């Protein structure tokens, strides 16, 4: 019988980690994460280590989005979260946050609380999971990971290779009792999780015109209709 694995993704951490993935491949532009492939790559890594079958039963993504009163057009972000749900099979938990006029300002506390609450909920549910894969190596997650291990669950944090002279406690991997497997660094898997886009012909949702595109999301709008769609969103 295969082990059940759930993936818990800190969306803010993953977004900020893209620069490291760019550098790993020697590129500054053109890198995108294959979100559909990402959970499976990490589960396969665990399966190879244990020499056991590992079944991915659920992928949970936690993130934030500027609130309506912040005055930012968030249509693109909502489309991204919809893409994760419809095309990648993710379960998303997204919180509206007042960014105070600064789109780059982030409040990680929402994401951390949501992720750890969900992790402990499933850890306490009999038969829900055997292994929790946590994408994000924030040391603030350590108490929740310790608690999940008390329920008999095995934990696999996924982080980035530490910078030179970094303090051990700046990452989950430097803390005791939070990991049941060798460290997994996302930058080591950069080539594996890189999205390779295929050119295909799609029909515009507004005008019905066919156009070649690499967009794989649920709704497609041609070059002429794209601006109209964004202005109406």
Locations of the language-model features?
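Extended, helix-rich structural scaffolds rather than catalytic motifs
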Residues: 10, 228-233
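Domain-level signal for Mg2+-assisted phosphodiester chemistry and nucleotide/NA-binding surfaces
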Residues: 1-108, 161
